[in-house]
């Protein structure tokens, strides 16, 4: 009998997907990694601890990778692997913030390439590595979930527990008898019970809610690193991009056209020529304007620049540098806009347009050199600082970006290609910043005798590894104008005697802190600094004893 209910199609029964298979090594290394994370990082800083944990993660992941996996043939995999190990070593050696950032970012990017070996974009690899944390945590939850046949297991344990009850009671009776009859056996067992009690007391003292949550954090992060569960979305999105701009007609019904578009277009045949004329006129005008600006900068800044006593060099560098960098970025954006699609194939005038755009790019490179010279003069006037080093890093990226714009102009490179190349360059700059002991170099540069005005508060606020350099140059503070910045952002004068007292206090605090540190929080640079002050203290004691002996 046909009824309405029978005519409705039944909803197919959905079967839950089986959990992602894990190897025995991964299951064993998960608790090991969580315990290692807790030992290395609980109430410790990221120093030698970060190097050891990174080596553990890299070794564990590589140990579970098949010999014929596609990831071994990926150049991005090897690049980020070397970057991860290099930055991790620099964390243990120098311990700078740039090294820590580079190590964590490199490890996540490397795990992203492990997940999807065919990825090329560094940003997509970073997002893939971060997203892998979510399915990994879900898979870890499946491991910790109680089995379905828990009831039968409990019954089985209860059965065997009752069988062992009588032997355990008998063992306890004989233990009491032997302890009464044999004093040495009694002393040995008392010592064992005391050790067990001390171990349990230490365990319960350290067990706290924050510590437990920190251990769970280590368990989650270790699972996110060790459980590489494939995530294909970003790799599928990247596969749609190409390295070059190809001429493709969308108004064609063909398998070669992924998304044919037959909508009415308002674009008329002469509109492309109008766009070409607009681009040509714009490039001609801005080239002329930029030529005037570059001519002024070359004549004023490049050769024989000597600022007047009343010249505001701070405004000249800070505001001028930011405005010039913004103009370079806008120039790159305009070139990318005009060469995004059809003008690449406009045969009547594409060569003229390319020549004009090339001249503009080269003039922007000249402008970048002018920005670098502004920054150089400011460094020669007031010393090194973090932002002044960062300006040079940004200018390196800018020059590389201008070179990739030339590739787009002459080789019809796509925007995807430019993003890929510039992301690799940004990653290289990050590794470059991670590999430098910049604070020590800044102290050595800023305390040169030619600088009469020194921001000594800025130098005292640097990490502890610069203290030996400050101590070696403390005798050069006399006769200088020392300043420091107060909590309200105002500059206050600092007497040389007060500066030496502040330095002595910093050294005393550093030695006390270094003595309290455990081995996971140590770096080679801080160890060298502590050794320097220890040797200096021993030399002082020897000199005092020698003077005391010479009096008698």
Regions found by a protein language model. Give the residues of each.
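N-terminal signal-anchor module of multipass membrane proteins
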Residues: 1-67
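Transmembrane-helix bundle segments that line or gate the permeation/cavity pathway
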Residues: 40-191, 210-239
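Short aromatic-rich membrane-water interface segments that cap or initiate transmembrane helices
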Residues: 159, 197-213, 310-327, 384-395, ...
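Membrane-embedded alpha-helical segments of integral membrane proteins
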Residues: 359-409
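Hydrophobic alpha-helical transmembrane segments in integral membrane proteins
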Residues: 430-456
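Extracytosolic and intramembrane catalytic regions of membrane-associated proteins
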Residues: 460-552
């Amino acid at each position: 009998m046909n009824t309405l209910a029978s005519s409705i199609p039944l909803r197919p029964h959905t079967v839950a997907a089986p959990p992602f298979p894990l190897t025995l090594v991964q299951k064993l290394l998960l608790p090991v990694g969580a315990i290692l994370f807790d030992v290395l990082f609980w109430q410790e800083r990221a120093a030698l601890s970060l190097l050891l944990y990174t080596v553990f993660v890299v070794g564990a992941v590589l140990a579970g990778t098949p010999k014929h996996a596609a990831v071994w043939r990926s150049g991005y995999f090897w690049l980020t692997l070397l970057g991860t190990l290099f930055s991790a070593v620099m964390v243990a050696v120098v311990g700078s913030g740039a090294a820590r950032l580079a190590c964590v970012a490199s490890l996540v990017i490397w795990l992203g390439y492990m997940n999807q070996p065919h990825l090329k974009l560094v940003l997509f690899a970073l997002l893939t590595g971060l997203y892998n944390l979510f399915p990994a945590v879900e898979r870890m939850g499946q491991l910790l979930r109680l089995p379905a046949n828990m009831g039968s297991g409990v019954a089985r344990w209860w059965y065997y527990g009752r069988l062992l009850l009588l032997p355990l009671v008998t063992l306890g009776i004989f233990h009491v008898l032997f302890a009464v009859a044999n004093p040495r056996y009694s002393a040995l067992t008392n010592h064992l019970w005391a050790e067990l009690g001390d171990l349990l007391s230490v365990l319960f003292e350290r067990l706290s809610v924050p510590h437990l949550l920190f251990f769970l954090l280590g368990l989650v992060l270790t699972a996110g690193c060790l459980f590489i569960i494939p995530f294909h979305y970003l790799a599928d999105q990247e596969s749609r991009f190409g390295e070059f701009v190809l001429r493709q007609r969308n108004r064609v019904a063909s398998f070669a056209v992924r998304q044919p578009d037959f909508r009415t277009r308002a674009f008329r045949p002469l509109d492309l020529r109008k766009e070409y004329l607009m681009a040509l006129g714009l490039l001609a005008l801005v080239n002329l304007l930029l030529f005037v600006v570059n001519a002024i900068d070359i004549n004023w800044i490049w050769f024989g620049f000597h600022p007047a006593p009343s010249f505001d060099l701070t405004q000249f560098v800070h505001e001028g540098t930011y405005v010039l960098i913004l103009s370079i970025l806008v120039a790159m954006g305009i070139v990318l806009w005009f060469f995004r699609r059809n003008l690449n194939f406009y045969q009547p005038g594409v060569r003229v347009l390319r020549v004009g755009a090339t001249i503009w790019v080269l003039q922007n490179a000249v402008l970048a050199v002018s920005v670098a010279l502004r920054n150089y003069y400011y460094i020669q006037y007031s010393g090194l600082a973090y932002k002044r080093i960062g300006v040079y890093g940004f200018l390196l990226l800018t020059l590389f970006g201008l070179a990739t714009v030339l590739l787009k102009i002459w080789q019809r490179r796509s925007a995807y290609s430019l993003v890929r190349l510039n992301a690799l360059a940004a990653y290289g700059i990050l590794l470059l910043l991670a590999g430098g002991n910049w604070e020590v170099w800044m102290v050595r540069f800023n305390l040169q005798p030619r600088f009469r005005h020194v921001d000594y508060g800025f130098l005292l606020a640097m990490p502890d590894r610069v203290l030996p350099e400050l101590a070696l140059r403390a005798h050069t503070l006399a006769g200088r104008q020392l300043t420091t910045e107060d909590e309200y952002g105002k500059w206050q004068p600092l007497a040389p005697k007060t500066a030496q007292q502040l330095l002595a206090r910093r050294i005393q605090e550093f030695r006390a802190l270094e003595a309290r540190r455990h081995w996971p929080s140590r770096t080679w640079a801080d160890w060298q600094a502590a050794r320097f002050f220890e040797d200096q203290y021993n030399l002082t004691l020897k000199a005092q004893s020698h003077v005391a002996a010479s009096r008698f």
